[in-house]
Amino acid sequence: MLEGRILAVSSQTKAVSGIPGAPKRVSFAKIREPLEVPGLLDLQTDSFEWLIGAQSWRERAAARGDSAISGGLEDILAELSPIEDFSGSMSLSFSDPRFDEVKASTDECKDKDMTYAAPLFVTAEFINNNTGEIKSQTVFMGDFPMMTDKGTFIINGTERVVVSQLVRSPGVYFDHSVDKGTEKDLHSVKVIPGRGAWLEFDVDKRDTVGVRIDRKRRQPVTVLLKALGWTTEQIAERFGFSEILMATLEKDNTAGTDEALLDIYRKLRPGEPPTKESAQTLLENLFFKDKRYDLARVGRYKINKKLGLNTGQPIVASTLTEEDIVATIEYLVRLHAGDTEMTAPGGVAVPVEVDDIDHFGNRRLRTVGELIQNQIRVGLSRMERVVRERMTTQDVEAITPQTLINIRPVVAAIKEFFGTSQLSQFMDQNNPLSGLTHKRRLSALGPGGLSRERAGLEVRDVHPSHYGRMCPIETPEGPNIGLIGSLSVYARVNPFGFIETPYRKVEGGQVTDQVDYLTADEEDRHVVAQANSAVDANGHFTDDRILVRRKGGEVEFVSSAEIDYMDVSPRQMVSVATAMIPFLEHDDANRALMGANMQRQAVPLVRSEAPLVGTGMELRAAVDAGDVIVTEKTGVVEEVSADYVTVMADDGSRKTYRMRKFARSNQGTCANQRPIVDEGQRVESGQVLADGPCTENGEMALGKNLLVAIMPWEGHNYEDAIILSQRLVEEDVLTSIHIEEHEIDARDTKLGAEEITRDIPNVSDEVLADLDERGIIRIGAEVRDGDVLVGKVTPKGETELTPEERLLRAIFGEKAREVRDTSLKVPHGETGKVIGIRVFSRDDDDDLPPGVNELVRVYVAQKRKIQDGDKLAGRHGNKGVIGKILPQEDMPFLPDGTPIDIILNTHGVPRRMNIGQILETHLGWIGKTGWNVQIAGDGSRPDWAEQLPEEMLSAPSDSNIATPVFDGAKEDELTGLLGSTLPNRDGEVMVASDGKATLFDGRSGEPFPYPVSVGYMYIIKLHHLVDDKIHARSTGPYSMITQQPLGGKAQFGGQRFGEMECWAMQAYGAAYTLQELLTIKSDDVVGRVKVYEAIVKGENIPEPGIPESFKVLLKELQSLCLNVEVLSSDGAAIAMADGDDEDLERAAANLGINLSRNEAATVDDLAN
């Protein structure tokens, strides 16, 4: 059943309801939503529950009337069973998949690098068909990764997300093209299965109907019909109405079924001797055997729907039938003839039209469950081969299911999927919103999907059928634009994998509260009105003509009697991140795209602050993201501390909720939870107990509300640069905590075992001051780059010992052995405080990789204050880099002395057309100061306030406001409220009704000559921090071949002096500078050392030598068999020295320089 039907929720408050204890937000929403936002993680959790056949999924399916469907694992075992041997005398079948308890908790899995998984067992039955003997056993099928409550998987200790894939649905697709030469209309059709060979029919420019089987050469379509057993008379009887098919039949020379079969066999298997039997088997296997060909339920459903077959009957056949092929050919010839309708075999009239491949009726989602199911299918088919072989080799009497089955291929297939598939991704954990959006992502890439290079503009473009299903705004910038999208807020996925969106039913011009979920195909058959169409209290449309949309995105005005459905909510078409942009309706789409994407890059701040101006989506997003702690049962809070909250439930049970304290996220941001309830407080089920990162009182809080002035300032905020007040640095307003993980292991080497120890050779006591007796740094130590975190020594290669050394070794034992210092040190450019240490040892029975005896992890936290070069952004795509941080006293200030926090340039607004930021600034000021609308003596309101609800007529200062997308505050309401703001304590109103204020220059005290827009804007600190980007090098690793420094911060590389920079030097004739840059500062190996020596000894810099890259060029030319000679200015040949220069080695050794630097060298090695 495709149309789900739910009864509407009782009349909702205009703010998002459904979560007890939610913070108060004054909302401008005027449209009542009859439906709550569905669970935002259902896309992931429902699909996985279907795969494992969970009880909750079965109950939901039964409620929907889908009782015929079995779970994903059951399906696949039924598909595989029975496995028979080659003679058919033995068979093995599988059934009843079930799981044991998971082996470890999610926290333990993350800590110990384990996979969060449960053991999977199935019942295997071996039947000996000769004797009738049945042996049944429960067989272990490996550990199966389980989904956490948050919709993620933990694989080897890291959290991963499986992204849903958008693919072309199996089915039958008709296409139209025009022949370039004759300008004739050509039509074709593809029958695309879930798996198996493609079948294509087409009408060519000579008006013959042809068929291509499995992408091979074209043949007349009548050959296929004859091969299926049709006679010429039967073909003429069925297709007599079509001239082109009769013409094709005349041109077809094959005499009967046998000849047609052989003809097809020759085309499919050229070079093999054709026989009737092999040809018959080949054709049957290609399309009519379910082992080789599978339309899947969805493909059968699509074919039946398109061709009008078996309507109203349950979906059974997963292979093609003869009737499918005949109906497809008839549809094609009628389409070519220009017919608009055809009568299907069942007597049903179906429209004849070409298909739009980018329509969401023809694209479906492969969700997590299906992706994992496909992977298990691969593993099981590999296992099937093994079982068959073992059936033939093992003794029949001794065979048990256990001896036949090898689970390795299945386990390997699952591991391969989670570890390496393009759709199993390292979870984006910058903040709760980024994680939530990642789980709701839809990707057209991946195995069986499109590739970046081949995807054209049509696939990437916004399509009318995306409305309410995929967000038209949120997609990446760059090569993946349009290929990766995000599920809309209200959308859900039906059992066939098509995305549905809810609509309110309209009956006889009256809007009811009945909600139906429609797929894109079904929506095309109806007339749909917008959510903001005016409706009276009884649900009747108040206007005579209402704007509606029809199939293909056409909009027009119609009378209310013609309307079938109405949108559920104004925010129905956008995704969660987009729905969190206030005044989205005033932003240009390109900037809204950046705004939605940049919210995902927000860094959690030390103190989160919910936005003054929100959209009402903040609460649901934060709760569903799963980073806040929610009460399971109603009760009373018994105990609260920084680490846990205990709740005594009304049924007498106690539950203790543990907080995550300063944990490291995947992206190195800090995930910290803190309680927001008090002892003795009563809490409802579903109420937020503790805030996580980027949340305040259970609401998403990605940034800070800052007092902003929009004005140019001395040119310092030119080109989107931003000017900040020093107050934000001093008071840690935009300070964030970042946690880095450093890891070192002690292994067994050929020369002996490495050892983690405090006893490091040639190191002063100062360096070891913070190490404990094991050689591991203490928690709380302040560290900077180069400091030792964990001491480790590695045995050096030993030469033959002298008698004296042997004596010393005998007396003092191992200590006299030569060891190298290979300690873990803080990388270049990093500082911080040690906040955690984890030690894993083989002696403590910890599970470690082979050859590793001990593993130490050190967590270093950095407190990063805001600084010049960091990137800030608003929610409207208005991003910029901090150009200057001014002392608080130099910032412009309001007439009451309040200094501005942040100055943005006016030039960043007009051409970008993101006016939402200006409206947000004004509304932010209104919310901060509070307001009181003046009511006349007779109780009448001003005109602009007519539509405002009663509770909106006055509000105190610091009131949080919700202005939902497409249903928010109007301009006249903003103007009116700006004129009704509350005065400050001196009785003065700082900002006039036009939103502008007189500002004074902090340096001179003089007023600026023009009024300036002032208000509160929500500013986000982005993940692009200058500390992660700035980089400098003196000496470091060199490339092994060219001997030039490596590039990039990660490799501790140098700055490339490139072609254009050389031109600049040449243009100025700076010959010696240029020579120095190209030799001794780059890859003149000998010169580098000699210069270093000269500097140390205070001598003059010697002449540069030959660069290494020049020698490489000579070698490359010689490898092409060219005899290359280097001549001096007087024509004499110069010998290129290739050998080792002993003087050079000696000089380098004296100076303590290691010349064997290459790519493999790490920064730590170089510091030694």
Swiss-Prot record:
It is an enzyme of class 2 (transferase). Gene3D superfamilies: 2.40.50.100, 2.40.50.150, 3.90.1100.10, DNA-directed RNA polymerase, beta subunit, external 1 domain (2.30.150.10), DNA-directed RNA polymerase, subunit 2, domain 6 (2.40.270.10), RNA polymerase alpha subunit dimerisation domain (3.90.1800.10), RNA polymerase Rpb2, domain 2 (3.90.1110.10). It catalyses: RNA(n) + a ribonucleoside 5'-triphosphate = RNA(n+1) + diphosphate. Its EC number is 2.7.7.6. One of its GO terms (cellular component) is DNA-directed RNA polymerase complex. One of its GO terms (biological process) is DNA-templated transcription. GO terms for molecular function: DNA binding; DNA-directed RNA polymerase activity; ribonucleoside binding. Keywords: DNA-directed RNA polymerase, Nucleotidyltransferase, Transcription, Transferase. CDD domains: RNA_pol_B_RPB2. PANTHER family: DNA-DIRECTED RNA POLYMERASE I SUBUNIT 2. Belongs to the RNA polymerase beta chain family. DNA-dependent RNA polymerase catalyzes the transcription of DNA into RNA using the four ribonucleoside triphosphates as substrates. The RNAP catalytic core consists of 2 alpha, 1 beta, 1 beta' and 1 omega subunit. When a sigma factor is associated with the core the holoenzyme is formed, which can initiate transcription. This is DNA-directed RNA polymerase subunit beta. It comes from Rhodococcus opacus (strain B4). The lineage of its organism: Bacteria, Bacillati, Actinomycetota, Actinomycetes, Mycobacteriales.
